[in-house]
Amino acid sequence: YELHRQIPLLLHRFAKQNLRHKYKEENLFFLGQIGRRIHSAGRTMAVVAILLTISLATMFVGLTMGAGYKANMKAYYPYDAGVAIDAPLEKSSMDSIVSFTEEHCGVEDSVSYYLYAVPEKSIEALSLSDYNHLREILGLSPVVMGNNEFLVHCDTWNYMDGIRQGLKQQPEITLDGRTLTIAVTPILTEPMEQYQMAGTKGYVLVLPDEAASQLVGEKIRLAMKLEDGGYPELKSDLKQFLNSGKWQPELQSGQQLPEKVTMGVTVRAWGVANSLTGFTAISFCGLYLSIIFIILSCS
C-alpha cells in the first residue's frame, strides 16, 4: 500500500523540480491540480493501483499455468497408445492387442519390446533396435552406436547429475564377459515416458542388440502410433480387453509369472481430454479473479 501511495507523490515531486518544465505554459496549473488530487484522493488511487496489480497478476498466473499444464502433456503422453505389462511374456502375446486396436482405429506403426534386467545393476535396458523404433514412432532421428558401446536415456532431470557422476566413475560395464564403453553421446534426454514405457525409474540403459539378447526380458511393452491419434475411450476399451478372456498371453520359455503382475494402459487422447479440464479450470479461475479485481478497481 505504501509503495502505491508514495509513487504518485514522488513522480509529482520530480516533475516540480524541473523548473523550466514547471513554468512552461499551462504546466503550473496542471501540476497544482495533480498535486491537490494526489493529496485528496491518494488512498483511493493506491487501493485502485493495488487492485489492478492483483488483477494483472492473477490473469498472468492463470494463462501461464494453464498453458504450461497443457504443454506438459507431450512429455506425459509421448505415444498415441501404450501397454505396459510387468511380466516376461512372449512378444507374440501383444499381436492380439494390436489387432484389437486396429478394429477400433487405424494403427500406423507399433513395436513390442522388452525391458531387460541388467545383472547386479539397478537399471533396466533396451535393445538399440527397439530404442530406435520408439524414436521413429516419436518422430526422432535414429541413434547410431558401436557394437561395444552403450548409452543412457534419461528424461527426468533430477537424475541427470547422478547419472553423469556414475558414468565418470564407471565409464565401462561388463555383461556376460563382454565389456562395453560409453558412446560419444552418453546421455539422451528426449521425452519417452520413462516411468512406465521406456523404463520404470526415470532412466534406461540402451545396449547393442547382441548384448541385450543375452539378458532376460522381465517386462514387456507395446507402443503404438495411431491414425488421428486415437480416441479417449480407447483406454477403457483396451483395459477391458486385457482383463477379458479374449486375450491369451504366453510366457517366455523357462520363465514364471511374478507374484504381482502390474499392467498399465496409456492413451494420449484420453490424457489430453482430461488435461483440457484442468487447463480450462486453471485459466478460468485466473481470468475470473482478474475480472473481479478490475471491477472492484473501477467501482
Model features per residue range: what roles?
Residues 1, 40-65, 272-299:
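Hydrophobic alpha-helical transmembrane segments of multi-pass inner-membrane transport and secretion
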Residues 1-15:
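Hydrophobic alpha-helical segments
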Residues 11, 15, 19, 66-73:
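Membrane-interfacial segments
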Residues 14-33:
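Juxtamembrane inter-helical linkers in multi-pass membrane proteins
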Residues 22, 35-38, 272:
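Helix-boundary and loop/linker segments of multi-pass membrane transporters
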Residues 36, 54, 63, 84-87, ...:
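Membrane-embedded translocation segments of transport machinery
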Residues 58-79:
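Hydrophobic alpha-helical transmembrane segments in integral membrane proteins
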